[in-house]
Amino acid sequence: MLIGNKSLKYIMFIWLALIWIVSSVPASTLPKLDNFNLDTLAHLTVYLILGLLLFANHRRGLFNRYSRQQLLMAAVILAALDEAHQVFIPNRQVSVIDLAANIGGLALAYFISRWVQRRHDRNQ
């Protein structure tokens, strides 16, 4: 185990806080990603990492009272809230495309975690 359970939990919550902080910053102070594909890829990657951290913590017992599907739905709700709160931030707007990329990253993390779990179960 490269990272201890406690450390992984803190990394996940710090990552979530960083997502929320960056999305709370007015757009005029952030670097501009003019390329649509680059912005979409950034959203997908950020939420892929969050999902991988979430499901790794689940595998290690942090959220074991919830199913992986329940955690995915909670993360999707958080992504939607994160996108929705940007309506209150100067020069920011809600983007359905950004939300779709966020959900895509979470879904990809979900399927990766299922694949890893199945591989692990077969090898035991």
Which residues make up each language-model segment?
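Membrane-interface helix-boundary motifs at transmembrane edges
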Residues: 1-6, 59-66, 122
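"…centered on the first transmembrane helix and the immediately adjacent amphipathic helix/loop
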Residues: 1-57, 71
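Interfacial helix-loop-helix junctions of multi-pass membrane proteins
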Residues: 33-38, 79-103
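Membrane-interfacial alpha-helical segments at the cytosolic side of multi-pass membrane proteins
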Residues: 45-61, 104-120
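Membrane-embedded alpha-helical segments that form the functional core of polytopic membrane enzymes
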Residues: 64-80
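Transmembrane helix-loop-helix hairpins at the membrane interface
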Residues: 68, 92-93, 110
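Hydrophobic alpha-helical segments of small multi-pass membrane proteins
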Residues: 72, 76, 102-107
